[in-house]
Design a protein with these regions (language model features):
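Conserved, structured core segments of small domains
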Residues: 1-88
Length: 88
């Protein structure tokens, strides 16, 4: 499995607030399915970041585009494969 960093820059704050319950439900479901490594918002309100776990960029993009924030136009999507290194 590979890791993919999904940056979700804010496009529409009002839409984000409306879509938040669906976004949280989506994150919970994807987490239960083992498709999310980490997630969180940017403290400055600029958006958020989700680290997806997937076999390919195409698979990660399909999942990321199904996020209500992205599908609803509240957030943009910038997706990159992430070569994670754990520093001890």
């Amino acid at each position: 499995m590979k890791y993919f960093a999904a940056f979700l820059p804010m496009r529409d704050l009002e839409k984000s607030q409306e879509l938040r319950p669906g976004h949280i439900a989506f994150l919970d479901q994807m987490s239960q399915e083992g498709k999310i490594f980490a997630r969180g918002r940017f403290v400055d309100g600029a958006g958020g970041l989700i680290i997806y776990i997937a076999e390919s960029l195409e698979e990660a993009r399909k999942v990321a585009k199904s996020d209500p924030y992205v599908a609803g136009g509240a957030r943009s999507l910038e997706l990159h494969e992430w070569d994670m290194k754990i520093v001890s």
